[in-house]
């Protein structure tokens, strides 16, 4: 087959072949070869003349490129299909073709070309449209003599595959070519593409001829199961009070969204992206908009708004309505919402075996479609349409297993082996105690081994079976709730009263418990109304028989209002003075006038009102009082001519004496006034004519059954809330029982609450939990808490100190029996080979768990009956041949490598020259010459480059780079301190050089003039910790008595042998130990010592052992270990670490002793590219030593520490980039995002300003900068500066029996001669104060040294160490001083000797527990007498910190060692107990609390508070405050609790100074006091009674009356009055206040009389506005008629 020409040639050919332009213009165009796309049709293709679709075929499923014959060719005349051509496009979907030729000429049936799609991935956003590229190819070709900028013409239905373009800015459309290039889309809204000028169908799967279409969910050829249709409508409830309302939330990924609102409400969108950014989008005009990368079409009509979004949504859209008019709106919504969690099948898990036949499983995992991450399965169970696929199982590794060294591969699985299974743990406790909660359980996948062992395996092995249920509901019963008992009877028998009920907290079993919400408690009291009037409305006589004046009706009087003329205005009538019979009503009548100018009424004297005054009293009768019919018959009519004024009359009956079974009532006679019928005194009536006594029977009906109640029983509780019960029966009058329904009255309560007051705090003890073990010593725990039962039944948890009595034990031992013997195995060893098949071994021991929890090894015979465990198993490593080939391939592909050596090098003697290898960390002496080698692979050594602290190094007099790539430095000095980097292509390694000065401290590197680049993890202002350590080590090595190492004693010093130890495992041979001794000896002779990190770890461990044995003092050993670990455990940078680009080498890798390994840059390993230059933004770091500035404005760069002083007003922290670029800055404080405030000002460009900082502003401020290339972060500490404070303890300490004594400075210390004494000087201050020690009257001795924490160590003290030691702590803010006095005593224990006599023999008891007879020459053994000897050491008193100690108490024993009663040794002097510190190490962080403060108030309700901080107690005794995140949040104690005092003595309420004003700005304030004793006031001392009144200053009393101008006279002529406004105002603000504030001052008059012109004067107009009065028809009013007399008369 002929080879095809390059794409640009083909494109040029097509342009000239199909262009209608003249050939003369072709020479001006060099061709469109710049286009990345090209035509498919080959040169001279026979398809040029065939445009019919019948000549085309496509096989989109055939992706092969092999030259083979097609199986579909039946006639066999076709040759094999050729290779696929290059794709016509590089992105966006193109076409590729394949050709075949007919072997017999043109007699073959079928097509000779086929097509397929290719490059189906989307083009980048900035790529130009393919059709536009083809049009722009003609921009350099003249058309009709002119050049045009051609733009594509899309969606031509007549010729979709013709290249039609229109000239920009012209109304000119031209078909520039009959065919577009293959792969061009036919239309912009479909995937169909043009091939050879014909539009061919393309499905959503991007395949030719495919009919696949996207379903409603956007899934190609999907079934619509990944989304659900959401449709409906809702009514928008917006109003002037509720301006906005959420209508519907449409989540990210939704499609075919259509939201329509019908009505006046305005519809808008609130968006929220996955990154958390929010936005509001409102549109007023229709159009197509882009919202969060989502196309939104907005349509608007008069009463309709519609949003159409094809989707998918790129953010969450919340559609809201906003109020515009008072009319309801209806919102209709329709969209397809994606199912946010779907199942996805996983890949097959690894085969269960490597050979011999196994199986593989896969599973299904639930995936969050939005976040694209795996989530728990229950998220997918929420959707019913989500059906979890079943796991698939298939065989694997069917090849037979090879044999190796006689061991055959053990097949863990066979057809008879049970498959792995799920096993679950017990259910957890329910999440809630009632109301329905959940409980969970965990499960593991286990399998049974060939030996019957149940082993836990990976979860995927059990995926073939459904997982057990991990969650279930529990405690479904109702929670306790308030239940109200029946209401009591009303407290009154008539009218309005109260009734009560008992409200209890009842659980689902009907028991009275606590736990109900007090705020939801039902009310226990309410008002009640008895529908029986408190009088009996029974008429004494018919209405017709009453006198006329008794038949009065309520007159409807005309309501009077004040007018411009003074008028009598009545007040409302009062109630009738009686409820029955005649009474009186009264009212007030006042003279009032209406002031027109203020429209207010004012009161006038009565003489100002004309006319009669209205009545102020009138009689009333609500109804007649009760009387019997008989009384009316006894009425004696009065003669008409009688002059009698008073007479007797019956006024009803007394109440009936019984309510049933017959009672009686007496008639009541009263003396009445005949005319007024008012009751008067009986003495006014003639006693002779008093009516006779009369009685009548009443309530004669039989009595109904009634409720009978018994007495209340005892209360069920003494406090909190108890219950009392009583018997309630329904009984007939004869005490016979009756059914309860026959008792018509309300049943009395049979239950009531009692003792409703809070109980005192008490211990609440719960049940013991299950023992932690069944044997071998376990523990049982229970909760013991201090609780208080409240009146509502709930419990209040209190602190333990509030409960009286001892607290019960919360734990106890259990299962104190020995466990039976059992077999225990260790861990499997490493595989014996690195490739192929090997073996693993493990050890097995027989042991027993004793009752006290110790594991006791036993003889193997004790476990002989137990089934043995497998001790050997095979292991399969990768095939050796495969590893070798991979290594070769890997080594061949790798770039340069640097062969670094991770070692620590310490120089002890002066040497002229030292050789180092890259990767080391060296501590050298000044003036030493050093050569640093940089061995490399696959790199030319002469091209090696060197850097120091990030700057390139060049050859100089003192520094040079050899041809082999080594670095030479002559005569090391302070400027040479730093980090040196060897760069070999993409590989980098470093070496750290530091210098040890003559004072055995590290020499500080001089400050650089120019800002230098810092490397994370490097502390260039590092303290002289190693110098202190090295000083001690040189003292140890130069001490001739202990540690001196000369040529003869190097191999004989046990201390050095113990220090060096074995750096290999315990299986190392003696030869290796001797070799290391020789290496060590040689190193010391050479004046230096080099060790790898594993050796250094061994050194630390052995030094700890020497400390325990006493060969090295505790303080010295602790100091050395701490300093060496702190110095050498630092992370050593192996390459330039740009944040966000490369990973940091973990420090653990530097402490594993990986010597001689090939090291390479981690970034080079990851990418294999030269990327040590930063790509993303890099912050400028200019490290400065911490210092305090007393300026008002402090400017600092990020990464430095800033101190706040009392003078500080503004702090500016700059966060600049090394290379300015666009980036986003984010600031946080203590991990919390900073927001702008009054004190915090963020400018968004990398600067933060803190104004008027206080202690609240101190913290860690972190600046984070990011852009699309990467990010960087740095932080600064802002601290509040404090002067030093020494936490001294003024107490005397006498410990002559201790070998090691540690005290806090302050007081007097008495120690034994030869002891080691540590005087600690704990100090607080910011910045950390410097500590120095002095001795008064002399200098510090040679055995005195300063420890790293500021403590003073005195070793092997002697008499010359006695004296006063002064600790001085200083920082920039001040100085603090504390002293301790040291006295030395003789040692008491254990060198004490006890002498006792028995008979004529003297015995001496020494600390060695041997007794000698001083007077017996025969050597006769002493009598078997008891004696004192040291006992066992006690447990350490603390698990960490600096206060741990253990005690060795003496015990009385016999000669055979048997312990006896101490009473047998009373005649002997008892030795003092031994004492030594223990567990001196850092404690984990925990919560510390201060003591509770006093109540915040002296009376009433307040609170106690305390400080809660997270601290860590360190081994040196100091307490370090750490971040609260270091402590467990759930264990955080309360910082506040309520407290209640006696009621407060309060000044009466009101303003700040209430009461009556006593003068200018002075008031009288008073309060009430009461004696708090329960009995009476006599128990209080009157002399101490608080004052009841006081004068107080009140601005409210600084007032005065203010008068306004007089208004015109109210009378147009004659006599009238005029008024003015009188206000009470504040003298300072001149604002009106309440008039009661001015009552102490005389009020000016507000009105006065006035006289107008004479009323009989001429009729003239007295105002200029009379013309308007006439036109407005106001002449009918007297006021205007008088003032406009002339005008009104003319009308």
From Swiss-Prot:
Q: What CDD domains does the record tag this protein with?
A: Ig
For the region Disordered, what residue ranges are annotated?
1146-1184
Gene Ontology cellular-component annotations:
extracellular matrix; extracellular region; intracellular membrane-bounded organelle
Sorted UniProt keywords: Disulfide bond, Extracellular matrix, Glycoprotein, Repeat, Secreted, Signal
Q: Which domain of life is it from?
A: Eukaryota
Instruction: Show the PROSITE patterns listed in the entry.
Output: IG_LIKE (PS50835), PLAC (PS50900), TSP1 (PS50092)
Instruction: List all disulphide bridges recorded for this chain.
Output: 87-118, 91-123, 102-108, 576-620, 580-625, 591-609, 831-875, 835-880, 846-863, 934-982, 1215-1263, 1321-1367
Tell me the ranges covered by the PLAC domain, including all copies. 1655-1691
- Asked if Iron is a keyword of the record, the answer is no
Q: Does the keyword Repressor apply?
A: no
Q: Where is the TSP type-1 domain?
A: 75-124, 418-468, 478-535, 564-626, 703-760, 763-818, 819-881, 1424-1482, 1483-1545, 1597-1644
Q: What are the subcellular locations of this protein?
A: Secreted, Extracellular space, Extracellular matrix
Q: Which residues form the signal peptide?
A: 1-26
Q: In which tissues is it expressed?
A: Expressed in epithelial cells of the colon, fallopian tube, skin, breast, prostate, epididymis, liver, pancreatic islets and bile ducts, as well as by vascular endothelial cells, smooth muscle cells, fibroblasts, cortical and ganglionic neurons and cardiac myocytes. Also expressed by malignant epithelial cells in colon cancer, as well as breast, prostate, renal and skin tumors. Expression is significantly reduced in colon cancer compared to normal colon.
What does the UniProt record tell us about how this protein is modified after translation?
Glycosylated. Can be O-fucosylated by POFUT2 on a serine or a threonine residue found within the consensus sequence C1-X(2)-(S/T)-C2-G of the TSP type-1 repeat domains where C1 and C2 are the first and second cysteine residue of the repeat, respectively. Fucosylated repeats can then be further glycosylated by the addition of a beta-1,3-glucose residue by the glucosyltransferase, B3GALTL. Fucosylation mediates the efficient secretion of ADAMTS family members.
InterPro entries in alphabetical order: ADAMTS/ADAMTS-like (IPR013273), ADAMTS_ADAMTS-like (IPR050439), ADAMTS_CR_3 (IPR045371), Ig-like_dom (IPR007110), Ig-like_dom_sf (IPR036179), Ig-like_fold (IPR013783), Ig_I-set (IPR013098), Ig_sub (IPR003599)
Residues covered by the Ig-like C2-type domain: 896-992, 1185-1279, 1296-1378
Write down what this protein is called: ADAMTS-like protein 3
Give the organism the record lists. Answer: Homo sapiens (Human)
* Gene assigned in the entry: ADAMTSL3
């Amino acid at each position: 087959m002929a080879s095809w020409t390059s794409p640009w040639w083909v494109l040029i050919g097509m342009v000239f072949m199909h262009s209608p332009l003249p050939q003369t213009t072709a020479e001006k165009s060099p061709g469109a070869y710049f286009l990345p796309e090209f035509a498919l049709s080959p040169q001279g293709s026979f398809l040029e003349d065939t445009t019919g679709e019948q000549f085309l075929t496509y096989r989109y499923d055939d992706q092969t490129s092999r030259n083979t014959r097609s199986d579909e060719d039946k006639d066999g005349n076709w040759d094999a299909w050729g290779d696929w051509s290059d794709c016509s496009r590089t992105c966006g979907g193109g076409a590729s073709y394949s050709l075949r030729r007919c072997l017999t000429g043109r007699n073959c049936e079928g097509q000779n070309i086929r097509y397929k799609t290719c490059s189906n991935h989307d083009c980048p956003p900035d790529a130009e449209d393919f059709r536009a590229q083809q049009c722009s190819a003609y921009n350099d070709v003249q058309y009709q003599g002119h050049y045009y900028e051609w733009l594509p013409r899309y969606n031509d239905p007549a010729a979709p595959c013709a290249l039609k373009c229109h000239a920009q800015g012209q109304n000119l459309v031209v078909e520039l070519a009959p065919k577009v290039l293959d792969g061009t889309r036919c239309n912009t809204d479909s995937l169909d593409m043009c091939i050879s000028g014909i539009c061919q169908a393309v499905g959503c799967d991007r395949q030719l001829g495919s009919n696949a279409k996207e379903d409603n969910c956007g899934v190609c050829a999907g079934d619509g199961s990944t989304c659900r249709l959401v449709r409906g409508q809702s009514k928008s409830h917006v109003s002037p009070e509720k301006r906005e309302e959420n209508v519907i939330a449409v989540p990210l990924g939704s499609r075919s969204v259509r939201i329509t609102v019908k009505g006046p409400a305005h519809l808008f969108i609130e968006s929220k992206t996955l990154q958390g950014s929010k936005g509001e989008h409102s549109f007023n005009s229709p159009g197509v908009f882009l919202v969060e990368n989502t196309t939104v079409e907005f349509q608007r009509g008069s009463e309709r708004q519609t949003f159409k979004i094809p989707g998918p949504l790129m953010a969450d859209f919340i559609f809201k309505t906003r109020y515009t008019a008072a009319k309801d709106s209806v919102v209709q919504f329709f969209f397809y919402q994606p199912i946010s969690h779907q199942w996805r099948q996983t890949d097959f898990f690894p085969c269960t075996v490597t050979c011999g036949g196994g199986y593989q499983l896969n599973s299904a995992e639930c995936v969050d479609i939005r976040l694209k991450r795996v989530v728990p399965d229950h998220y997918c169970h929420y959707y019913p349409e989500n059906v979890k696929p079943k796991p698939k199982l298939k065989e694997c590794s069917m090849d037979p297993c090879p044999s190796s060294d006689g061991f055959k591969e053990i097949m863990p699985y066979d057809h008879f082996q049970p498959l792995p299974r799920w096993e679950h743990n017990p259910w957890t406790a329910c999440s809630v105690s009632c109301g329905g909660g959940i409980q969970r359980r965990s499960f593991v996948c286990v399998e049974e081994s060939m030996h019957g062992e149940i082993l836990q395996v990976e979860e995927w092995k059990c995926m073939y079976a459904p997982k057990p249920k991990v969650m279930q509901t529990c405690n479904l019963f109702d929670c306790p709730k308030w239940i109200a008992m029946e209401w009591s009877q009303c407290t009154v028998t008539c009218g309005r009263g109260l009734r009560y009920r008992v409200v209890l907290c009842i659980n689902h079993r009907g028991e009275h418990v606590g736990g109900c919400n007090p705020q939801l408690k039902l009310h226990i009291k309410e008002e009640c109304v008895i529908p029986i009037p408190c009088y009996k409305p029974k008429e004494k006589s018919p209405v017709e028989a009453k006198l006329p004046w008794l038949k009065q009706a309520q007159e409807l009087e005309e309501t009077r209002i004040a007018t411009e003329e003074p008028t009598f205005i009545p007040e409302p009538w009062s109630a009738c003075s009686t409820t029955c019979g005649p009474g009186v009503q009264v009212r007030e009548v006042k003279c009032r006038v209406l002031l027109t100018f203020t429209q207010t009424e004012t009161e006038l004297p009565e003489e100002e009102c004309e006319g009669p005054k209205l009545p102020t009293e009138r009689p009333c009768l609500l109804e007649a009082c009760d009387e019997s019919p008989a009384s009316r018959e006894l009425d004696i009519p009065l003669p008409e001519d009688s002059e009698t004024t008073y007479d007797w009359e019956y006024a009803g009956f007394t109440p009936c004496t019984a309510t049933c079974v017959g009672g009686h009532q007496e008639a009541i006679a009263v003396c009445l006034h005949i005319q007024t019928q008012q009751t008067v005194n009986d003495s006014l009536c003639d006693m002779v004519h008093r009516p006779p006594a009369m009685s009548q029977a009443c309530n004669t009906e039989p009595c109904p059954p009634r409720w009978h109640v018994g007495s209340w029983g005892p209360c069920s509780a003494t406090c909190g809330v108890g219950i009392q019960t009583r018997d309630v029966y329904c009984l007939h009058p004869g005490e016979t029982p009756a059914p309860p329904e026959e008792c018509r009255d309300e049943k009395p309560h049979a239950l009531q609450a009692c003792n409703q007051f809070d109980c005192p705090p008490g211990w609440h003890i719960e049940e013991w939990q299950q023992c932690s073990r069944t044997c071998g010593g376990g523990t049982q725990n229970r909760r013991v808490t201090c609780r208080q039962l409240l009146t509502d039944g709930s419990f209040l948890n209190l602190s333990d100190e509030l409960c009286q009595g001892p607290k019960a034990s919360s734990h106890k031992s259990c299962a104190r029996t020995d466990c039976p013997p059992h077999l225990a195995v260790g861990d499997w060893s490493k595989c014996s080979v690195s490739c192929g098949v090997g073996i693993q071994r493990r050890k097995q021991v027989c042991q027993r768990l004793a009752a006290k929890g110790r594991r006791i090894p036993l003889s193997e015979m004790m476990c002989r009956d137990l089934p043995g465990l497998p001790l050997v198993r095979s292991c399969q490593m990768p095939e050796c041949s495969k590893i070798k080939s991979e290594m070769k391939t890997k080594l061949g592909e790798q770039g340069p490598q640097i062969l670094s050596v991770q070692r620590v090098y310490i120089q002890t003697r002066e040497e002229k020259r030292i050789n180092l290898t890259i990767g080391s960390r060296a501590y050298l002496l000044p003036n030493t010459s050093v050569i640093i080698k940089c061995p490399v692979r696959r790199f030319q050594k002469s091209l090696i480059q060197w850097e120091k602290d990030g700057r390139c190094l060049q050859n100089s007099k003192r520094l040079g780079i050899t041809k082999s790539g080594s670095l030479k430095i002559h005569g090391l000095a302070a400027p040479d301190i730093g980090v040196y980097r060897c760069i070999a292509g993409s590989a980098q390694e470093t070496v750290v050089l530091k210098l040890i000065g003559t004072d055995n401290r590290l020499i500080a590197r001089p400050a650089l003039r120019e800002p230098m680049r810092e490397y994370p993890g490097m502390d260039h202002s590092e303290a002289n910790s190693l110098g202190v350590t090295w000083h001690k080590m040189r003292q140890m090595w130069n001490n001739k008595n202990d540690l001196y190492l000369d040529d003869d004693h190097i191999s004989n010093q046990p201390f050095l042998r113990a220090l060096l130890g074995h750096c290999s495992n315990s299986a190392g041979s003696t030869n290796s130990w001797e070799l290391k001794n020789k290496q060590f000896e040689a190193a010391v002779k050479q004046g230096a010592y080099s060790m790898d990190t594993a050796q250094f770890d061994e050194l630390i461990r052995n030094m700890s052992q020497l400390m325990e044995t006493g060969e090295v003092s505790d303080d010295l050993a602790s100091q050395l270990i701490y300093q060496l670990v702190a110095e050498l455990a630092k992370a050593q940078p192996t390459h330039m670490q740009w944040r966000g680009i490369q990973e940091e080498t973990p420090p653990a890798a530097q402490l594993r002793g990986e010597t001689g390994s090939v090291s390479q840059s981690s970034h080079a390993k990851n990418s294999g590219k030269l990327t040590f230059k930063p790509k993303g933004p890099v912050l400028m770091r200019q490290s400065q030593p911490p210092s305090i500035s007393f300026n008002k404005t402090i400017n600092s760069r990020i990464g430095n520490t800033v101190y706040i002083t009392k003078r500080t007003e503004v702090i500016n922290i700059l966060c600049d980039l090394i290379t300015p670029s666009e980036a986003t800055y984010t600031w946080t404080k203590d991990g919390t995002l900073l927001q702008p405030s009054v004190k915090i000002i963020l400018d968004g460009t990398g600067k933060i300003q803190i104004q008027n900082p206080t202690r609240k502003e101190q913290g860690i401020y972190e600046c984070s900068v990011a852009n699309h290339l990467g990010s960087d972060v740095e932080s600064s500490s802002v601290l509040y500066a404090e002067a030093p404070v020494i936490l001294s303890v003024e107490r005397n300490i006498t410990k002559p029996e201790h070998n090691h004594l540690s005290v806090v400075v302050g007081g007097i210390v008495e120690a034994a001669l030869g002891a080691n004494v540590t005087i600690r000087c704990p100090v607080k201050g910011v910045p950390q104060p410097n500590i120095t020690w002095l001795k008064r009257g002399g200098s510090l001795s040679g055995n005195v040294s300063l420890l790293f924490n500021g403590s003073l160590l005195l070793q092997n003290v002697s008499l010359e160490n006695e004296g006063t030691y002064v600790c001085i702590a200083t920082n920039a803010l001040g100085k603090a001083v504390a002293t301790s006095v040291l006295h030395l005593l003789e040692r008491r224990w254990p060198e004490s000797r006890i002498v006792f006599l028995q008979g004529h023999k003297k015995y001496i008891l020494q600390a060695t527990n041997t007794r000698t007879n001083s007077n017996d020459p025969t050597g006769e053994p002493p009598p078997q007498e008891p004696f004192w000897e040291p006992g066992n050491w006690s447990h350490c008193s603390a698990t960490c910190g600096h206060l741990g100690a253990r005690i060795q108490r003496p015990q009385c024993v016999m000669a055979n060692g048997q312990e006896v009663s101490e009473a047998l040794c009373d005649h002997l002097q008892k030795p003092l107990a031994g004492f030594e510190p223990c567990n001196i190490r850092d404690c984990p962080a925990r919560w510390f609390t201060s003591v509770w403060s006093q109540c915040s108030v002296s009376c009433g309700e307040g609170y106690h508070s305390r400080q809660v901080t997270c601290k860590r107690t360190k081994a040196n005794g100091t307490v370090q405050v750490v971040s609260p995140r270091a402590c467990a949040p759930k264990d955080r104690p309360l910082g506040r609790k309520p407290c209640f005092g006696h009621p407060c003595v309060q000044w009466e309420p009101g303003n700040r100074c209430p009461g009556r004003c006593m003068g200018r700005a002075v008031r009288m304030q008073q309060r009430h006091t009461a004696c708090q004793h329960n009995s009476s006031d006599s128990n209080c001392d009157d002399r101490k009674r608080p004052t009841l009144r006081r004068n107080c200053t009140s601005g409210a009393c600084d007032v005065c009356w203010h008068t306004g101008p007089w208004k015109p006279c109210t009378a147009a002529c004659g006599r009238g009055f005029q008024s003015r406004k009188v206000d009470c105002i504040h003298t300072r603000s001149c604002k009106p206040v309440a008039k009661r504030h001015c009552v102490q001052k005389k009020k000016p008059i507000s009105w006065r009389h006035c006289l107008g012109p004479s009323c009989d004067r001429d009729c003239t107009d007295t105002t200029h506005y009379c013309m308007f009065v006439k036109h407005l028809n106001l002449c009918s009013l007297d006021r205007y008629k008088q003032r406009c007399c002339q005008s009104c008369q003319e009308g």
